[in-house]
Amino acid sequence: SGGMQKRAAIARAMALDPEVLFLDEPSAGLDPSTSAGLDELIRNLSESLGVTFVVVSHELPSIFSIADTVIMLDKKTQGIVAQGDPRELRDSSDNPLVRQFFLREAAGAEVT
């Protein structure tokens, strides 16, 4: 399954004992339950082994599950739009691009 393939890829990368691991859309194409399990695995590996994960994602449930810090980029300017705790950005950002992202994405995702 897709979830097992992604877990195996992470396991292969972790065998190299990295300090930082880059994951590009790790939960893309997975059903919500499998995605949540993968998010939990990433979070547990980060906490237990001290590995920093840099995760590229557009999926709010994953962002809120995994991220301690979010850096949002603007596709047009290729610059940083906002940076910080994902919940603080969601709840208090005055930046229209940040607000638009969270509003657009929240329409299909439950985030606590």
What are the residue ranges of the model-derived segments?
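A short, surface-exposed alpha-helical micro-motif characterized by mixed small hydrophobic
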Residues: 63-65
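A short, proline-enriched helix->beta-strand linker immediately N-terminal to the Walker B motif
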Residues: 15-19
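Helical segment within the ABC ATPase nucleotide-binding domain
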Residues: 36-48
